[in-house]
């Protein structure tokens, strides 16, 4: 009777295991390569969109001091991160200072932002103002705090900008925020009013910019996860149920899933306005309109059916072209 070939069997098992491990490593490598490729695409897309928005609206000029409002959320972290990267390659010189308004919310981790900003070497200022107590005292239980909180915060940030000598105030609102604001004003305010990428502040002393205006929120979520920003949750507004803005956010997310391109077209429509085909008499002189006997390209022909967008278009509002603030091939 032959003895069992224990050594040969063990060797065969070891070979099979080694082969399986190698296959697993190759599969992991391919997956990692794909993830790295997608991450790089995401980064380049956000950089391109931010650079394009800055160029389209002349948000940042040579010699500017940009006050980046940093809340500790994903949007403001991403805005600061991208602006720092753009500044490295920009053909102009501008300074960046990060500002956080500590509103004295219970449990707010005061150490997170100073540690992060010190680590990445960005000048910063922490403004301590107990707006939390004011909001809680003045707003009835169950009512939204957003309106009062934003007014208080806005006034403080305008003052701080003046004290720091900032020429631009950068806020982290993105594409979805802008469309949400449009829908809110239409549904609840009876206005065609959105959230502009650039505006003069209420006091007339500051210019507010929104560099993330062209960026989708889902991209910012992925980017924040990729960069591992130390996110700080907001206890004032994010935890409140039944907010109208939350309803608009859910609606936009649903449209993005079911009807690709719909939200993009709504966003692009904000930069393709035809006042003669609306109803605002302050924008178009309807009362004095008379037949001139000359053909008008914006007349009846405007009611003809136009080709619908496919949803694949990636152009910015108004068909604007990217600016040359950064050489994207070098990223």
Curated annotation (Swiss-Prot):
[4Fe-4S] cluster binds at residues 146, 149, 237. Its main location: cytoplasm. GO terms for biological process: tRNA thio-modification. CDD domains: TtcA-like (cd24138). Keywords: 4Fe-4S, ATP-binding, Cytoplasm, Iron, Iron-sulfur, Magnesium, Metal-binding, Nucleotide-binding, RNA-binding, Transferase, tRNA processing, tRNA-binding. It is an enzyme of class 2 (transferase). It comes from the Bacteria. Binds 1 [4Fe-4S] cluster per subunit. The cluster is chelated by three Cys residues, the fourth Fe has a free coordination site that may bind a sulfur atom transferred from the persulfide of IscS. One of its GO terms (molecular function) is ATP binding. SUPFAM superfamilies: Adenine nucleotide alpha hydrolases-like. Pathway: tRNA modification. It holds the Pfam family ATP_bind_3. GO terms for cellular component: cytoplasm. Its EC number is 2.8.1.-. A motif (PP-loop motif) lies at residues 71-76. It catalyses: cytidine(32) in tRNA + S-sulfanyl-L-cysteinyl-[cysteine desulfurase] + AH2 + ATP = 2-thiocytidine(32) in tRNA + L-cysteinyl-[cysteine desulfurase] + A + AMP + diphosphate + H(+). The keyword Metal-binding applies. InterPro entries: Rossmann-like_a/b/a_fold, TilS/TtcA_N, tRNA_Cyd_32_2_STrfase. Belongs to the TtcA family. Catalyzes the ATP-dependent 2-thiolation of cytidine in position 32 of tRNA, to form 2-thiocytidine (s(2)C32). The sulfur atoms are provided by the cysteine/cysteine desulfurase (IscS) system. The thiolation reaction likely consists of two steps: a first activation step by ATP to form an adenylated intermediate of the target base of tRNA, and a second nucleophilic substitution step of the sulfur (S) atom supplied by the hydrosulfide attached to the Fe-S cluster. Homodimer. This is tRNA-cytidine(32) 2-sulfurtransferase. It comes from Burkholderia multivorans (strain ATCC 17616 / 249).
